[in-house]
Regions:
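Short, conserved loop/helix-junction motifs that constitute active-site signature segments
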Residues: 154, 250, 286-289
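Conserved SGNH/GDSL esterase-like catalytic core that processes O-acyl groups on lipids
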Residues: 64, 132-133, 172, 178-276, ...
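Glycoside hydrolase catalytic-domain groove-lining segments
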Residues: 269-294
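N-terminal secretory targeting modules
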Residues: 4-5, 16-162, 166-188, 371
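Extracellular serine-dependent O-acyl
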Residues: 293-298, 306-343, 352-371
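Sec-dependent N-terminal signal peptides
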Residues: 6-11
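Sec-exported extracytoplasmic/periplasmic mature domains
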Residues: 167, 201, 205, 260, ...
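Structural recognition of the beta-strand scaffold that forms the well-ordered cores
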Residues: 158-162, 167, 204-208, 253-258, ...
Length: 371
């Protein structure tokens, strides 16, 4: 009986201390190895990355942001801030795998161990939306005495995908259409955008966000939302407006715009405002990338009525643009029918994304002469 009371008392003491916020955090062993800061010049970044907050820490929140480096040694670890989220990692071009940074404190995750001694290459892609997690990459940890070496040059071919939840990879790892949104089932690596880019041997950026529209975000007011894609597009980080993005840092030869699913997915929309804002946004994109070919896409999710309206609008915009700009194009994905399954909340499944990539690839190969 005495033992039981002691255990109960200990439990109460711990609970009271936790409630008071006075729990002392554990002291962990120091990180062993050579720490390489995120600002190291031999680390390559693709995507919108900011060092404004801390010159040695890389901040980002768009899915598809990629970090690459070549290193000496037999192991590699990665440092991130607490709860940064999920990445896909690939070592020496082998099978990619998913890693997560979900600890309450700064995280260290092993990406590779027991590699043959020599030079190796790591590619790490952020595969979720980091708006609420505020992800930070803080560097790599190498074996003692080892260091980074010059990495192979990034591909000369560059693509930018501007999109919404489809391009993000919302629910792509789920196999149940009734599942809610979860970071655990979002994965940009598995999207049509990444598959297309890999197939074309191109680097790509993804300026995409679930729920975003060109004039009206998901289920927004008929008059539109102020925080739509045209407004967010100017900034380095989504929904953080203290740093404008320098478009000279990344000039793609190809831009694919896939916006409209959220604008038109619920009934309270104004098709004329959609067209007006799309025209203005197209001019903005052209002003940022004067030499790029721009393709306006329609996605696979809208119903027949809304999809028909969207296609008519984009066809008209394209025809008008082509009077003075011959490098504006159109492409429609086929509708998802359910035969390939659905991801979470009726979004495209992994197989549907593969089908989308298979549809888009021949069009882009011919358009860009990228064989």
């Amino acid at each position: 009986m005495k033992k039981v009371w002691v255990m109960m008392l200990a439990t109460l003491m711990v609970s009271s201390t936790m409630m008071a916020g006075n729990v002392k955090k554990s002291t962990t062993l120091p990180i062993e190895g050579e720490i390489v800061k995120a600002s190291h010049p031999m680390i390559q970044y693709v995507g919108r990355v900011s060092f404004a907050k801390n010159p040695d820490v890389a901040s980002f929140n768009y899915p598809g942001t990629t970090i690459e480096a070549s290193f000496q040694g037999s192991s590699l670890k990665m440092l991130c801030s607490p709860k940064t989220g999920y990445f896909m990692a690939q070592i020496d071009g082998c099978e990619p795998f998913k890693v997560g940074f979900n600890a309450e404190r700064d995280s260290v995750v092993t990406l590779a161990a027991a590699l043959p001694k020599g030079v190796h290459h790591a590619k790490v892609m952020y595969v979720i939306e980091g708006l609420f997690r505020k992800p930070e990459f803080r560097g790599f940890v190498l074996d003692k005495g080892c260091h980074l070496v010059e990495a192979p040059a990034l591909p000369e071919r560059k693509i930018e995908f501007i999109g919404n939840l489809i391009t993000c990879g919302y629910g792509v790892e789920s196999i149940n259409r009734s599942d809610p949104f979860e970071d655990e089932t979002e994965n940009h690596w598995l999207t049509y955008a990444n598959i297309v880019s890999d197939s074309l041997k191109a680097q790509h950026t993804s300026i995409s966000r679930s729920g975003i529209g060109v004039y009206r975000n998901y289920n927004g007011p008929k008059t539109g939302d102020a925080d739509n894609m045209p407004w967010q597009y100017e900034y380095t980080l989504f929904d953080q407006h203290d740093e404008k993005w320098d478009f000279a840092k990344y000039q793609p030869q190809l831009v694919c715009i896939n916006l409209g699913t959220n604008d038109l997915s619920t009934k309270n929309y104004d098709i004329q405002l959609y067209e007006k804002n799309y025209r203005m946004f197209l001019k903005t994109v052209r002003s940022k990338y004067p030499h790029a070919k721009i393709v306006m896409l329609t996605g696979p999710m809208l119903g027949e009525k809304e999809s028909s309206k969207q296609r008519t609008v984009l066809d008209r915009i394209c025809a008008d643009a082509n009077k003075t700009d011959k490098n504006i194009y159109r492409f429609d994905f086929s509708f998802q029918k359910g035969d390939l399954g659905y991801g979470a909340s009726w979004h495209p499944s992994m197989l549907q994304h593969r089908k989308m990539a298979a549809e888009l690839l021949p069009f882009l190969r011919k358009l860009m002469n990228w064989n």
